[in-house]
């Protein structure tokens, strides 16, 4: 009833049960909202099986990166929930930085589909009159702020890669119109892994 078969995490029903708990959360409670990026792009370019694998990888990596005493569940689709107990704002920031480092390390094994996500959190200690649902709504709003920031960072990185490609072609004293074939071997995030150029 409470298991998400695709990821092995607690499912939406369990997440909703925890969020609807009328008991006021303890002051040390934190709620984190995670949202995967680029799932639609992966589904469209590589197929839904690749998208499902992307979700599973994130779920496994997130659960492994979080201490066992913290709850991690899937609220649906590409969205996940974590409920923490104990960390203050600084400690939770450090924990989320640790999670990001662990997921970046996991992504090195999958250069074509590195894990990209946004996260926001809210603490009961900062919102003493809030219930669990209120904390989740605040965390979700903060997640969307982070999502816009992540998208801007990825767009800037994409532009830098395009500029590097242009510099490489210029160093060869060629232009794109000279190329008989150019294989940049771009992954779904337009990251250049290797290149081969053949010119007329």
Model-predicted regions and their roles:
Residues 48, 85, 89, 93-100, ...:
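Catalytic-core segments of nucleotide cyclases and related cyclic-nucleotide turnover enzymes
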């Amino acid at each position: 009833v409470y298991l998400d078969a695709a990821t092995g995490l607690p499912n939406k029903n369990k997440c909703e049960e925890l969020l609807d708990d009328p008991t006021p959360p303890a002051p040390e409670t934190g709620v984190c909202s995670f949202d995967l990026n680029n799932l639609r792009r992966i589904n469209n370019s590589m197929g839904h099986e690749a998208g499902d694998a992307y979700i599973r990888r994130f779920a496994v990596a997130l659960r492994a990166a979080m201490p066992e005493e913290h709850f991690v569940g899937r609220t649906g689709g590409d969205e996940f929930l974590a409920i923490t107990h104990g960390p203050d704002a600084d400690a939770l920031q450090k924990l989320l930085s640790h999670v990001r480092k662990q997921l970046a390390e996991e992504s090195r094994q999958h250069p074509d589909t590195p894990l990209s996500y946004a996260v926001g959190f809210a603490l009961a200690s900062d919102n003493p009159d809030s219930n669990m649902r209120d904390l989740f709504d605040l965390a979700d709003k903060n997640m969307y702020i982070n999502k816009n920031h992540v998208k801007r960072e990825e767009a800037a990185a994409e532009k830098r890669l395009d500029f590097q490609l242009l510099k490489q072609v210029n160093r060869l004293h060629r232009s794109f119109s000279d190329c008989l074939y150019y294989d940049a071997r771009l992954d779904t995030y337009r990251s250049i892994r290797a290149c081969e150029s053949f010119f007329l």
